[in-house]
Amino acid sequence: MTRNSASRETIDVLIDNAKSTMSYSEQLLQNAELIKSKFSEHHITHYLQLLFELLSGSLSAIYEVCSDIKNMLSTENVYTKRFHMQMINLSQYELSVYLVGRDQGGVISELITYLNKSHQDSKELEDILQQVKLLGEQCDIRLRNVTAHYDNPNTMYTMLTTLNDEDVYVKRFGNQLLIHDKILKYISSVLQIITEKLSPDKKNCTYKKSVEE
C-alpha cells in the first residue's frame, strides 16, 4: 500500500475534518430534503427544483466519500483500505453521472440548458460542469461497474488487489471538495438574490457559512 510520508498529526487532522464535514453535510442535506418535500405543495420553478437537486446530490456524495476517507485513513488493514477506495470510486463516478448525465441530461446540464433558454449567464455552472467531468474521467469505470452490479465477484476481487495508492483517492477527494465549494457558493448567491427580491428591506443582510476545510 502506497502512501506519501505524512505525519500522524496530519492524518488525524484529515480524519477530524472528514468527521466535521460529514456532520455539516448531514444537517444541510436534511434541510435541503425538507425543502424538496415541499415542492409538491407549492408552485415552484423548475430552476429551483434543479437547484436543490444539485445541492442534495453534492451533499450526499460528500457525506459518502468523507465517510470512506475517514475509514480508509483510520485503518492499517490493506483490505479495508481497498474496500473504501472502491467505494470512493463508485460514489464519485455516480456523482459525475448525476450532475453531468450520460447524454448531457444531468442536473447541471439541465440547469445550463434552462439558463441558456432564458438568456441568462451560465458561465459559472459551465465551469463547474467541466470540473465534474474531469472528476468522472479520473474514476475507474470498470471497477465501478463490477462494484455496482456485483455479478462477477472474482473479477472484482482481482481488481481490488491492484488498488494500492490511497494518495490518489485523497487527492481526488480534494478535487471533489473544490467542486462542492463552488456549488455551495453558486447556490448561496442565487438564494441571496431571491431573498433580496422577496425582502427588499433586507438587502444588506449577509449570509455566512462555515465549512471545515
Give the ranges of each region predicted by the language model.
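Amphipathic alpha-helical interface segments
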Residues: 1-138, 163-213
